[in-house]
Each structure stands twice: as C-alpha cells, then as structure tokens.
C-alpha cells in the first residue's frame, strides 16, 4: 500500500482490528520511509449477479433499487427501518447464496413478496399489484383471498 504522505510503496501493518460487526478490518499502518502512521479499512467486495429484466436486458444488481421498491410498498406503513433492512439483507443473502452469475428479476420479485408478506400485508398487496401487473379489482381480491388462506393454514 502506498503511503498517503510521501507516496512510498513500502508500509507495514502495526495493528489490525475487526470493526462493523466483523464486516470490516481496520488496520494501522506505518510508512517505512517517512514513519508516518495512517489508518485503512478493508471490506470484502461481494459480486452480485446480473439481473435479467422482463424485456431481456441485463443490469447489475443495485441494492438501492431493491430498497426503493420496498420503501414504496411500505410507505406510511408501521414497519421499522430496522425490519426493512433485515428483509433487504435476507433477500441479498439469498441471492448471493444461490451463487449464480445471472438471476431473473422475477426471482428477486418473489423474494421481495415473501419478505413483504412477513412484514406487512398491505405492503405485500401494493407490491404485488405492480409486480404482477394487476388489471382490475378482481386481481386484488384474488391476492387478498390467497393471503387469507395462507394465514388460515398457518393458524
């Protein structure tokens, strides 16, 4: 690593510690030329798969797109930011766990629906209406009836 002070190539690690719940490593380094000390942070770069859209286009996975879609469905609903973030982490971990280079947007949508169903039924119906392209009120009724049946089965 280059020294940010004198730009020498040789530095040594003086101290290393885990931070951010083990997701990052904080390192204190010392330049072997000018002896200045500085701190670096290292995080693992996890490559997410490409998303295959309905029209066949391929786009990189963007967690912000996932978050904004879920936030839109959860607007004015009593769901905490922590619960939303846990759901987003669950979805991204599932996508990563599959280990595929490309993944259909439909699969991502199904994972979102599963999490929204768990978090808030109104948000689930909102998201489903866009995701499944509801045409009329009967589509809403059908989805609500399915939800009622799933709730009865769980009881």
Curated annotation (Swiss-Prot):
It comes from the Bacteria. GO terms for biological process: negative regulation of DNA-templated transcription. Coiled coil: none annotated. Residues 49-139 form the ATP-cone domain. A zinc finger (unnamed) spans 3-34. Binds 1 zinc ion. Keywords: ATP-binding, DNA-binding, Metal-binding, Nucleotide-binding, Repressor, Transcription, Transcription regulation, Zinc, Zinc-finger. One of its GO terms (molecular function) is DNA binding. Its cofactor is Zn(2+). Negatively regulates transcription of bacterial ribonucleotide reductase nrd genes and operons by binding to NrdR-boxes. Belongs to the NrdR family. PANTHER family: TRANSCRIPTIONAL REPRESSOR NRDR. This is Transcriptional repressor NrdR. It comes from Legionella pneumophila (strain Lens). The lineage of its organism: Bacteria, Pseudomonadati, Pseudomonadota, Gammaproteobacteria, Legionellales.
């Amino acid at each position: 690593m280059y020294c940010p002070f004198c730009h020498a190539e040789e530095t040594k690690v003086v101290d290393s510690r885990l931070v951010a719940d083990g997701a990052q490593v904080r390192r204190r380094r010392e330049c072997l030329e000018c002896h200045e000390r500085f701190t670096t942070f290292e995080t693992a770069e996890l490559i997410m798969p490409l998303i295959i859209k309905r029209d066949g286009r391929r786009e990189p996975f963007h967690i912000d797109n996932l978050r904004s879609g879920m936030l839109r469905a959860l607007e004015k609903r009593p769901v905490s930011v922590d619960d939303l973030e846990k759901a987003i982490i669950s979805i991204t971990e599932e996508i990563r766990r599959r280990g595929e280079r490309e993944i259909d947007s439909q699969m991502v949508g199904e994972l979102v629906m599963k999490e929204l169903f768990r978090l808030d039924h109104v948000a689930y119906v909102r998201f489903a209406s866009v995701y499944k392209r509801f045409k009329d009120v009967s589509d809403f009724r059908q989805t609500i009836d399915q939800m009622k049946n799933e709730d009865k089965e769980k009881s």
